[in-house]
Amino acid sequence: MPEGFSASADAFMCPCGGGVYRLCCAPLHRGLKRAETAEQLMRSRYSAFARTEVGYLLATHPEPGRDDKLRRAELLRSCGQTRWLGLTIREVLGGGSDDLEGTVEFEARHRGGVLKETSLFQ
């Protein structure tokens, strides 16, 4: 089973707030399904940060020219240091299943405060 997965954890609510994890972001994290919208990708990435699904984070945000081992170590450190508490989607522009790109404005709450961001997904 990929990192971060256990059968019992699948029954819990998804960190992104979209329902039960096994029906929400788990299929994306396991590579059984791809995100169909910018919002779904945003939610799945938030969930991956909250669950330390580093493989998924690397796969969904490639950085050519950067060493994957270094990126993996940075992500593991970041995930281990941050306690994510919740996600609020503020606005979605485009990013539907037929769109080439979309933007998602969100707030990701963590123990140290709130990350407010508008991300472009292509």
Sequence positions of predicted segments:
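Short, low-complexity N-terminal intrinsically disordered segments enriched in polar/charged residues
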Residues: 1-44, 51
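Surface-exposed, charged secondary-structure patches
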Residues: 78-114
